[in-house]
Design a protein with these regions (language model features):
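Histidine-acidic metal/acid-base catalytic patches
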Residues: 1-112
Length: 112
């Protein structure tokens, strides 16, 4: 449906208690030629970092609204990193999401 996840996240962020990390690559040529109901597939579900989603914005919005829990990476549906490559894709996605949040977690010494 081509709904912008960042716009929706801003509306619903205060109600979120669990996040699944999933990305998508849109084939805009297929959309322009056949629309989203055309005979040609226009979207491929990917692991975070391999699609079009702006994960830096998503993590910033989540954190600025108090979300402190995990992001569960979904990868079994990725057309590239599946089967024996799924764990490789999962690790790439994990490292990418860590980068998006600003790197490794380092607690502030004066905060409890």
């Amino acid at each position: 449906q081509l709904i912008d996840p960042v716009t929706e996240l801003r509306k619903w962020c205060k109600k979120i208690v669990h996040v699944h990390g999933k990305d998508a690559t849109i084939d805009w040529d297929a959309v322009r030629h056949g629309g989203i109901s055309g005979a040609v597939p226009f979207v491929w579900h990917r692991m975070p970092g391999f699609g079009d989603t702006n994960w830096r914005d998503i993590i910033s919005i989540l954190r600025s609204n108090g979300y402190e829990d995990d992001i569960c990476i979904e990868g079994y549906h990725d057309p590239v990193y599946n089967g024996e490559l799924e764990m490789t894709g999962q690790l790439h996605a994990l490292n990418y999401l860590k980068w998006c949040r600003g790197g490794e977690f380092t607690p502030t010494p004066w905060e409890k």
